[in-house]
Amino acid sequence: DYKIIISNYHIVICKNVIYKYMSSLKKISLKDIAEAAGVSTALVSFVLNGKKKEYRVGEETAQRILKIANEMNYQPNLAAKSLRSGKTKTIGLVVSDISNPFFSQLTRVLEDEATKQGYTVLFGSSDEDASKMNHIVGSLLNKGVDGLMIVPCENSEKFIASLVNDNIPVVLFDRYFPEINVSYVALNNFNAAYVSTKYLLDSGYNAPCMVAYDVNLIHMKERVRGYKKAMSDAGKKKMINVVFLKQDSPKKSADRLLPKMVESGADAFLFGTNMISLACLYTIKDMGQEVISKIGLVGFDGNPVFDFFYSPISYIRQPIDVLVQKALGILVDNISNGNTVQSVLAEGEFIEMAP
């Protein structure tokens, strides 16, 4: 016969192991934490909901509760919490194209800023398709998001208006619809295009041409308007030249239109977006070094690809951090206090790239 001797120490160790194993199998409750910490369930609730100062919970007690909750792998019941508060602490983001570096950066910055305020971001990409945008927004609302930040696409006015009429907290980003009374945050596109065009003229270029998308969206219309105003103010109204690329096939449009512009005297290009820049740079490269060396180039938003092009490309840098902080601030305020329409137009920074 064998004798098994188990000390009190080993019994405690075994109990802890068994307890942790059992804890992993069941949902840990506030009551479980309270029993382990030797305090009331209410006290645990105050600490875990960030109300320890409000209810004057001692720091040592609060830290003990947090430590035990962590050791027990406590996961809050978000569904129950949202039912009590009516909030899920989630925000829906819809961008037009997540592969666009500008919108990728927007998503990254928003995730960071939202986390600081206790929010999680769910996002989707509309691919500039109104029906797809509507579907994504519907899915986000079904998931219970507290509010929406949307980069609207063409022909989405009625849908955006319906969200506003339903009192859903919405902030439009980068683009907006002047006829709809809804909050928005965007670049001052008119000023940005005006400054960019003036830079080309002041640099000695005689006939800058603007390249835009053939879309009926405010950010593009304002950029075209800024270009035209700068040309007019410089006494070059008759030399205003805007070419429009098809948004679904920009490279094909650029190959067809840009050589004609150069042949007709265009000596510089203002690109309406960074994606337009990328499409056009390939076309300009194919025109040969003689053309490249003489053409002035300015775009919107930087891109790592610009560093490898044969000619310097100056650009308007959008203050993405400021834009996101403003938009998130408005959205959170509307979620907490009800919809109040606010609008922000931020100024861009012109970045001159030396030859």
Task: Please annotate each region the language model reported.
Residues 122-142, 193-194, 242-263:
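Structural motif
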Residues 255-355:
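Flexible loop/turn connectors
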Residues 183-210, 229, 250-259, 277, ...:
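Hydrophobic alpha-helical segments within soluble ligand-binding/sensing domains
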Residues 114-125, 207-210, 228-251:
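Short beta-strand elements in bilobed, periplasmic/extracellular small-molecule ligand-binding domains
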Residues 1-87:
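N-terminal helix-turn-helix DNA-binding module of bacterial transcription factors
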Residues 150-195, 275, 301-313:
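Flexible loop/hinge segments that line or gate small-molecule binding clefts
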Residues 194-235, 342-355:
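An alpha-beta-alpha
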Residues 23-29, 69-102, 106-108, 117, ...:
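N-terminal helix-turn-helix/winged-helix DNA-binding helices
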